[in-house]
């Protein structure tokens, strides 16, 4: 089971943003099917919302996490069966790039890790849409 929860750090205060509050630190296999399905559903939700069309960076992100693209990336990697996840990853993203945290989050998920994200301090609409 993919136990998703997003905790974000705002100005040194950890705040639960979405998902489950008590995330079990379960190590998943890299590029597991449940994560790939989740990303594909997220992609569709972002693309299908007409209001998101005014944010090209968000639409680009949504196309990047589509099933076909993730499977293409997976196919390019060698020996995924021998790879082991680390457990929990803490991401600190720059405050001047709205969706940098989302790309880090995806890489964390795809490598089978639980993630804690520090969201940008600036009030970007893309961050609110994503979270």
Show where each model-derived region lies.
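Conserved small-residue-rich beta-alpha loop and adjacent elements
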Residues: 75-131
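N-terminal Rossmann-like NAD(P)+-binding subdomain of aldehyde/semialdehyde dehydrogenases
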Residues: 1-86
